[in-house]
């Protein structure tokens, strides 16, 4: 059975391609998801994508992932800096997760430099543009294989 990754995108990421292209680029979320699915398939991994602008919907989707996915790749968007609820959901389901950001959050406003997720993530990828999703999926796939060997 192929490994399973859930890709979660948080608020405003549905506006990729048109929202602040100088920061986030011109690639759309549909493009990101298509590229992520292609990358996952090349690694013999099944990828499901989910996006929501609502914290509770993200929490619910994480809960639904318990026992159904092997890893989560999450770009929490602005919830990175505010959501204890999403953090607790991730910890509650005990699924390894990779935190990813399109921009380098450490080179932006001071308030963007704190993450409620980084200390619990198996990896954090930021500042690579949308390529960060490819890197996150590849890392998650490798992490799952290494975990299976232990």
From Swiss-Prot:
Active site: 24 (proton acceptor), 101 (proton donor)
EC number: 4.2.1.10
Organism of provenance: Verticillium alfalfae (strain VaMs.102 / ATCC MYA-4576 / FGSC 10136)
Function: Is involved in the catabolism of quinate. Allows the utilization of quinate as carbon source via the beta-ketoadipate pathway.
Enzyme class, first EC level, given as a word: lyase
PROSITE patterns: DEHYDROQUINASE_II
Catalytic reactions of this protein: 3-dehydroquinate = 3-dehydroshikimate + H2O
Sequence similarity: Belongs to the type-II 3-dehydroquinase family.
Ligand binding (substrate): 75, 81, 88, 102-103, 112
Lineage: Eukaryota, Fungi, Dikarya, Ascomycota, Pezizomycotina
Protein name per its UniProtKB record: Catabolic 3-dehydroquinase
Family matches, as InterPro entries: DHquinase_II, DHquinase_II_CS, DHquinase_II_sf
Gene giving rise to this polypeptide: qutE
Site (Transition state stabilizer): 19
PANTHER family: CATABOLIC 3-DEHYDROQUINASE
Subunit structure: Homododecamer. Adopts a ring-like structure, composed of an arrangement of two hexameric rings stacked on top of one another.
Superkingdom classification of source: Eukaryota
Molecular-function GO terms, alphabetical: 3-dehydroquinate dehydratase activity
GO biological process: 3,4-dihydroxybenzoate biosynthetic process; quinate catabolic process
């Amino acid at each position: 059975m192929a490994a399973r990754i859930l890709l979660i995108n948080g608020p405003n990421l549905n506006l990729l391609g048109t929202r602040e292209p100088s920061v986030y680029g011109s690639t759309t979320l549909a493009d990101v998801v298509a590229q992520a699915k292609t990358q996952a398939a090349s690694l013999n991994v099944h990828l499901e994508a989910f996006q929501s602008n609502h914290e509770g919907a993200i929490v619910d989707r994480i809960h639904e992932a318990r026992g159904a996915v092997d890893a989560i790749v999450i770009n929490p968007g602005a919830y990175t800096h505010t959501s204890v609820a999403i953090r607790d959901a991730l910890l509650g389901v005990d699924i390894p997760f990779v935190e990813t950001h399109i921009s380098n959050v450490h080179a932006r406003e001071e308030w963007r430099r704190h993450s409620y997720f980084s200390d619990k993530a198996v990896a954090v990828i930021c500042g690579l543009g949308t390529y960060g999703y490819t890197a996150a999926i590849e890392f998650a796939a490798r992490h799952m294989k290494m975990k299976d060997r232990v």
